[in-house]
């Protein structure tokens, strides 16, 4: 009972802070995303048992911050230097470090830090990019929340009541095929209702297609997080949110959904 109360209290407080800063947008929201991305990166490094306070950890953090940088602040790109060149320079530094420490920091760990910074940095970057879109940026964020949360809830309740066939037992034993499909159906229904209220500038058929893709990719993001935790033998990615785990535990679906939402909006606009 105490754990449930803690879980509810944490969820309510976190949702209030998150939604408030989403509504405010601009610099406060960007700072929130930077903070969340930094914590998420440290959660991944901790899974790998890499030192957080170290030169590789610092390089990984700086690389993450560079990927998170909103488009309007990419001042260095005006000088012909792209994020790709900076990422390459960071990789070269990490590879040099493996030599200096005589392989106590390995090539595999260079790859892990680089991939972690790209995965967390680029995916959270699109949170900022979508919020900074025209007058519908805020509405698109709420739309993504509706799709993800309705998919999660639909998958859980349909899976509990009708689930028989395991979706991927080696990765997430509790997920079922019926729950996976149920999450998509519930997301489509609630996205349709959301469109009736919000009136996004997207034809209904396109909205349904986007919702379908996002619901699927959101569940894939959840499975990827489950696979990571199972591989590194951890229950939760972190404990910054009591009763809910870490940032990765709560935003695994968003990390897959936000880039695809941005690309699909560009495709269908």
Swiss-Prot record:
It is found in: Cell membrane. Its EC number is 2.7.7.41. InterPro entries: PC_trans (IPR000374). Pathway: Phospholipid metabolism; CDP-diacylglycerol biosynthesis; CDP-diacylglycerol from sn-glycerol 3-phosphate: step 3/3. Belongs to the CDS family. It is an enzyme of class 2 (transferase). One of its GO terms (molecular function) is phosphatidate cytidylyltransferase activity. The chain crosses the membrane at residues 13-33, 50-70, 81-101, 110-130, 138-158, 180-200, 201-221, 247-267. One of its GO terms (biological process) is CDP-diacylglycerol biosynthetic process. It catalyses: a 1,2-diacyl-sn-glycero-3-phosphate + CTP + H(+) = a CDP-1,2-diacyl-sn-glycerol + diphosphate. GO terms for cellular component: plasma membrane. It is a multi-pass membrane protein. Keywords: Cell membrane, Lipid biosynthesis, Lipid metabolism, Membrane, Nucleotidyltransferase, Phospholipid biosynthesis, Phospholipid metabolism, Transferase, Transmembrane, Transmembrane helix. This is Phosphatidate cytidylyltransferase. Coiled coil: none annotated.
